[in-house]
Regions:
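Core AdoMet radical
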Residues: 1-5
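Auxiliary Fe-S-binding modules of radical SAM enzymes
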Residues: 21-106
């Protein structure tokens, strides 16, 4: 669960994911906080969560890379909301934040 003031920094998430791996637990999901009464102070906007997760690319191994998800209100299931790297114009965003042509890979 991504929580404001608890684990809403790249350093905190990196330490958490590394500690989980050291305990032989794969960080499978990073949940976006559900909108519920009394939780507003812990809310991290989705765009900020995406930026945080993207900033960990290259800092942690793929095993420590969870799927950032949103549990759709109303019981409609979970959907991945992680950072997007492939753009509709055929470019990809690299770990350095710059954009490159995906070339013939599309």
């Amino acid at each position: 669960m991504l929580l404001r003031g608890v684990n809403d920094s790249a350093d905190a998430l990196e330490a958490l994911f590394r500690a989980m791996l050291a305990a032989r637990v794969k960080p499978y999901y990073l949940h976006q906080l559900d909108a519920a009464p009394g939780t507003a102070r812990f809310h991290v906007p989705i765009a900020e969560g995406q930026r945080l997760l993207a900033s960990l690319r290259g800092r942690v191994t793929g095993l420590a890379w969870p799927t950032y998800i949103l549990d759709i209100p109303g019981g409609h299931g979970k959907v991945p909301i992680g950072p997007g790297y492939l753009n509709t114009d055929g470019t990809v965003r690299g770990p350095d934040g710059r954009y490159y042509s995906a070339g013939s890979s599309l």
